[in-house]
């Protein structure tokens, strides 16, 4: 397709569960991308985990062919994007490849916190936005009220918002006409020299790395020699194509189009998301700006339960990193858990999804350490450090001050649940910044410490609002804080995998909870086991697992008391030796359960 005025590149943005993927299904069905037999629910959500959870994790692309009412045939490139704040990097990449967006809002729920986050990204990318109100067939639908909400909160005109029911296929033709008439075509190509944006990549066991590109200038052809501008790697293009959503092979991709190519690329490191791809012989002079990298904010350790699985874990992480550029990892070792990896994520859901993908797609059984965030340490000698692993925390005597990250959180909640939500935020050391009302719902803006959020905040927010609250956050500032390194000792030995950095006011509560949990999990042995929580040299909590008593007198049937005394003295000496030299074996099941203590 070489005439760009008949191309439209657009994304669908929305809050979770407002009907993005269902609308994508209906658009594919209406344009004949798949026949009725091939259609399934959430057809663009290709991972099992996406369908089970009802969320989109990976942005997907599909080319649709639509004959408009004006008689012309148009080629529509749809980018279906995630809604959850943890996958904002996927959203940003999709938006950079498009000129416009459909803003889908549930007409029974209205504007939610993550709707705001995603629509502001679209506005920052200079997108034209078409509001679409979904679920108008439901009795609770309030389209006029939601239109007013969109105009008041987001500030875009919603008077001509398209009314649809994606589930029942109502209004789908109106959406397609709005895409044609309201969204712009790609800019005309300014040169014949190839310039393409690397939007995404994934690993295929037969083809090597598959690269998704948006062609900005020129054309990408089969057998062409192309260069990655960031790494200067050169490859010969073997296959070129696009998704309908089935894979469709073609010979060329022209300016304005979105498609994929393969080139027997085996080195994962050559494919940097946001890189510029150009012709080896006639290279473009200036690379595209690419994407602003998302910085991981939540960290934890992944350790294989079987040390023989380490290399398999290493290869699996490399393949996942190719498919998810916002995920980072580095090797680390623990005296308790062996060798593993310290991994960085955009949030807790991101962590959970990566963990589940490693389990499902690569059949790995992992131990995951407690999540932590990046702390800034100001040393007495003038050095400034950034750490996210409690084991790396220097001696407290050498530290001048410590800073922790704070976030700015926006919570939208029905007014009947305001009291419980405010109590939760206060409990988490939050500072209220704003409190306003949108009809019968409140918009609350809080400043919260990130390390209070990474454990159980989202679950408790949903629980105390009966699932009605929506939550979106962004990094704000680092502030001085009274932080301590909470260490767990078993019989005087520090268990590094259970160490965590907490605010001093929370240390005793968290330490006591961990000690009680470990007491229930570690099996009794022939000596007393002391489980202690300490801050520096001070013990703040202790639990004791009482010894099992082996009856050494069971084989004595009466007789001289000196024989019994001799056996008891021998047992006593043995226990003394065990206390002196014995190591307590903590089962891995105890580690796994204890590391779930986070929010208690």
Curated annotation (Swiss-Prot):
Q: Which residues take part in binding GTP? A: 17-22, 134-137
| Gene (UniProt) | lepA
Q: Which reaction does it catalyse?
A: GTP + H2O = GDP + phosphate + H(+)
Q: Where in the cell is it found?
A: Cell inner membrane
InterPro entries noted in UniProt: EF-4, EFG_III/V, EFG_V-like, EFTu-like_2, G_TR_CS, LepA_C_sf, LepA_CTD, LepA_IV
List the keywords (alphabetical). Cell inner membrane, Cell membrane, GTP-binding, Hydrolase, Membrane, Nucleotide-binding, Protein biosynthesis
Summary of the function given for this chain in its UniProt record: Required for accurate and efficient protein synthesis under certain stress conditions. May act as a fidelity factor of the translation reaction, by catalyzing a one-codon backward translocation of tRNAs on improperly translocated ribosomes. Back-translocation proceeds from a post-translocation (POST) complex to a pre-translocation (PRE) complex, thus giving elongation factor G a second chance to translocate the tRNAs correctly. Binds to ribosomes in a GTP-dependent manner.
- The broad enzyme category this protein falls into is hydrolase
Question: Which GO terms are recorded in the biological process aspect for this UniProt protein?
Answer: positive regulation of translation
The segment(s) forming the tr-type G domain are 5-187
Any one GO CC term of this protein is: plasma membrane
Q: Which Pfam families match?
A: EFG_C, GTP_EFTU, GTP_EFTU_D2, LepA_C
Per its UniProt record, what NCBIfam families does this chain match?
A: lepA (TIGR01393), small_GTP (TIGR00231)
- Give membrane topology per the record: Peripheral membrane protein
- The protein depicted here goes by the name Elongation factor 4
Species the sequence originates in:
Rickettsia prowazekii (strain Madrid E)
Q: What is its main location?
A: membrane
Task: Answer yes or no on keyword Disulfide bond.
Answer: no
Enzyme Commission number(s): 3.6.5.n1
Write out the similarity annotation.
Belongs to the TRAFAC class translation factor GTPase superfamily. Classic translation factor GTPase family. LepA subfamily.
């Amino acid at each position: 397709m070489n005439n760009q005025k008949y191309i439209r590149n657009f994304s669908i943005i929305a809050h979770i569960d407002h009907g993005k993927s269902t609308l994508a299904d209906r658009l594919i069905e209406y344009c004949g991308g798949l026949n009725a037999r091939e259609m399934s629910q959430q057809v663009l959500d290709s991972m099992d985990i996406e369908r089970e959870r009802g969320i989109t994790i990976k942005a997907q692309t599909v080319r649709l062919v639509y004959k408009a009412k004006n008689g012309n045939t148009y080629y529509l490139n749809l980018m279906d994007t995630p809604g959850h704040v943890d996958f904002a990097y996927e959203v940003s990449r999709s938006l950079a490849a498009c000129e416009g967006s459909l803003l889908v809002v549930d007409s029974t729920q209205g504007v939610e916190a993550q709707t705001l986050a995603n629509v502001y990204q679209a506005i920052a990318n200079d997108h034209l936005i078409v509001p679409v109100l979904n679920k108008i067939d439901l009795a609770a639908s309030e389209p006029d009220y939601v239109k007013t909400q969109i105009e008041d909160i987001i500030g875009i005109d919603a008077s001509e918002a398209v009314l649809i029911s994606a589930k029942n296929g109502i209004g789908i033709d109106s959406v397609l006409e709005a895409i044609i008439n309201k969204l712009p075509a790609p800019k005309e190509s300014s040169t014949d020299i190839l310039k393409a944006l690397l939007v995404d990549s994934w690993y295929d066991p037969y083809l090597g790395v598959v690269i998704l590109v948006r062609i900005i200038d020129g054309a990408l052809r089969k057998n062409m020699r192309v260069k990655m501008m960031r790494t200067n790697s050169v490859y010969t293009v073997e296959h070129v194509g696009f998704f309908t959503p089935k894979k469709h092979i073609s010979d060329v991709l022209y300016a304005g189009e979105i498609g994929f190519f393969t080139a027997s690329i085996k080195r994962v490191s050559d494919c940097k998301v946001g890189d510029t791809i150009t012709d080896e012989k006639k290279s473009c002079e200036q690379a595209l700006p690419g994407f602003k990298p998302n910085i991981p904010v939540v960290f934890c350790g992944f350790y294989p339960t079987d040390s023989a699985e380490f290399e398999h874990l290493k290869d699996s992480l490399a393949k996942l990193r190719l498919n998810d550029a916002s995920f980072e990892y580095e090797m680390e070792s623990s005296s308790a858990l062996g060798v593993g990896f310290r991994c960085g994520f955009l949030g807790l859901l991101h962590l959970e999804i990566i963990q589940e993908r490693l389990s499902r797609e690569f059949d790995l059984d992992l131990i995951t350490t407690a999540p932590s965030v990046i702390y800034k340490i100001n040393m007495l000698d003038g050095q400034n450090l950034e750490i996210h692993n409690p084991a790396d925390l220097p001696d407290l005597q050498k530290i001048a001050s410590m800073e922790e990250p704070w976030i700015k959180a926006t919570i939208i909640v029905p007014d009947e649940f305001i009291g419980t939500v405010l109590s939760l935020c206060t409990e988490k050391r939050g500072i209220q910044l704003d409190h306003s009302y949108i009809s019968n719902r409140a918009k609350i803006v809080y400043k919260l410490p990130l390390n209070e959020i990474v454990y159980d905040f989202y679950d408790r927010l949903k629980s105390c609002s009966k699932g009605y609250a929506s939550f979106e956050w962004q990094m704000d500032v680092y502030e001085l804080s009274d932080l301590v390194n909470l260490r767990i000792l078993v019989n005087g030995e520090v268990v590094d995998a259970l160490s965590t950095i907490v605010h001093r006011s929370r240390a005793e509560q968290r330490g006591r909870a961990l000690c009680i949990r470990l007491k229930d999990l570690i099996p009794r042995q022939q000596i007393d086991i002391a489980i202690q929580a300490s801050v520096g040299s001070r013990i703040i909590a202790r639990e004791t697992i009482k010894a099992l008593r082996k009856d050494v007198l069971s084989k004595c049937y009466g007789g001289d008391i000196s024989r019994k005394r001799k056996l008891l003295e021998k047992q006593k000496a043995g226990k003394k030796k065990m206390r002196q030299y014995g190591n307590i074996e903590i089962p891995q099941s105890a580690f796994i359960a204890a590391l779930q203590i986070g929010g208690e």
